[in-house]
Amino acid sequence: CAPTWRAEQEDYDLNFQQLVKSCKRKFGGEWVVLFRNHKYHKINTLKNQIDGEYVIDVSEYDDMQELICISNILITDYSSCMWDMLLTKKPCFIYAQDIERYTRRNGFYVPPSAWPFLIAKNNEELENNIMHFRDDIYQEKIKMHCKYLGCFENGNANKAIYDFVKEKLINKGIN
């Protein structure tokens, strides 16, 4: 879980216990929530849910990319980490209890209704989105969204850079 920063410093009311139960029922296996708060946002009401067993506070962990790599799903609101998760093609759910107000105040380049993610405004909607999640539909939405935005990610960035530099060096007579 990774909420974004808000000037209002409102508390995030995500029910971690219910989240873990929903993930177990839908996806099977054992689940642990890694909660990463925004570094400028101090959420107080969640502190009593962070038990170190099912919910671990990783707010001080610097590398969000590593957390995305080890995560099976992501729950966020408007944090840009959703787009990093999209590239992994792993499930991402939006928990945005203040979506109307946030949209009015801040706006979005691409409206949330066009995102490939299921959006929930409360814990019940989030549970419903998890329980009715279909990976085949999600993968198709990702593909269409990437096509719409012009995504060039194909997993070969290092090779493309290597080939580009090599070609430039060869053209200059450097081997």
Report residues per predicted region:
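A nucleotide-sugar donor-handling region in carbohydrate enzymes
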Residues: C1-D11, Q139-K143, I170-I174
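Catalytic binding pocket for nucleotide-activated donors in carbohydrate/polymer assembly enzymes
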Residues: L46-D51, S80-G150
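Residues at the C-termini of beta-strands that transition into short coil/loop
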Residues: A2-P3, N37, S59, A96, ...
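Conserved catalytic-core segment of nucleotide-activated headgroup transferases in glycan assembly
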Residues: C1-K47, E153, A157-K159
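Donor nucleotide-activated moiety binding/catalytic core segment of transferases
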Residues: L34, K39-W83
